[in-house]
Curated annotation (Swiss-Prot):
This is tRNA (cytidine(56)-2'-O)-methyltransferase. PANTHER family: TRNA (CYTIDINE(56)-2'-O)-METHYLTRANSFERASE (PTHR42197:SF1). It is an enzyme of class 2 (transferase). Keywords: Cytoplasm, Methyltransferase, S-adenosyl-L-methionine, Transferase, tRNA processing. GO terms for biological process: tRNA nucleoside ribose methylation. Belongs to the aTrm56 family. It is found in: Cytoplasm.
Length: 218
């Protein structure tokens, strides 16, 4: 199963923080790719920096200024997260059987076309709340919690779980209980960029080699 998250309706002047959170959740909760519309290089650079420091979990970080075309040319199942949709528990088992899934996460009011193009309009409850929470819950239900235990590829930092306090080590400095650094996750997934449609409309981004001190990710 391959999962991409498409964030549409992003407003660069007001949505940078929450859209970054959508991207971080996509990365940490099992998505293979994150696509932003419209393009906002500052958000994408933040995600690349996290991947550089904490290891690669995303196969693709990209943006498109033609989101409707991106959805129309997606060669797989389209899921739109909306409070007006069907309860997640009523459709998640069926969605889990699909090979390629595009999850649409809206910002401002989502145009009607996306509701019509989606194979599944899925609600994480029918009350107003955060799209970040909706994406996290959807992906966790989709993977049944297994997404939390993937190991990233490469990276510079690892957290060693502790009962109290904080323990962060550089890759290569883990002790016997810290796990092998740079272990490639056994995800059973395709190569980089698989599942991306409308390549002429999507601009991919290589990750820059930045090196910051440990701090908040947003």
């Amino acid at each position: 199963m391959k999962v991409y998250v498409l964030r549409i309706g992003h407003r660069p002047d007001r949505d940078k923080r929450i859209t970054t959170h959508v991207g971080l959740v996509a990365r940490a909760f099992g998505a293979h790719g994150f696509v932003l519309s419209p393009c906002d290089e500052k958000v994408l650079e933040k995600l690349r920096d996290v991947e550089e420091r904490w290891g690669r979990l995303l196969e693709e970080i990209a943006c498109t200024n033609s989101p409707l075309k991106y959805v129309k040319t997606w060669d797989g199942t389209v899921v739109h997260l909306t409070m007006y949709g069907l309860p997640v528990d009523s459709v998640i088992d069926e969605i889990r059987q699909k090979d390629k899934i595009l999850v649409i996460v809206g910002a401002e009011k989502v145009p009607r076309e996306y509701y019509e193009l989606a194979h599944y309009n899925v609600a994480i409850g029918n009350q107003p709340h955060s799209e970040v929470a909706a994406l996290a819950i959807f992906l966790d239900r989709l993977y049944g919690g297994a997404e939390l235990y993937r190991q990233p590829v490469g990276g510079k930092l690892r957290i060693i779980p502790t009962e109290k306090g904080k323990k962060v080590v550089k890759v290569g400095e883990e002790g016997p209980s810290g796990g092998a650094p740079g272990v490639r996750a056994e995800r059973g997934r395709g190569g980089r960029g698989e599942g991306v449609q409308g390549a002429d409309e999507v601009r991919g981004h290589k990750r820059g080699a930045t090196d910051r001190d440990l701090g908040d990710e947003t």
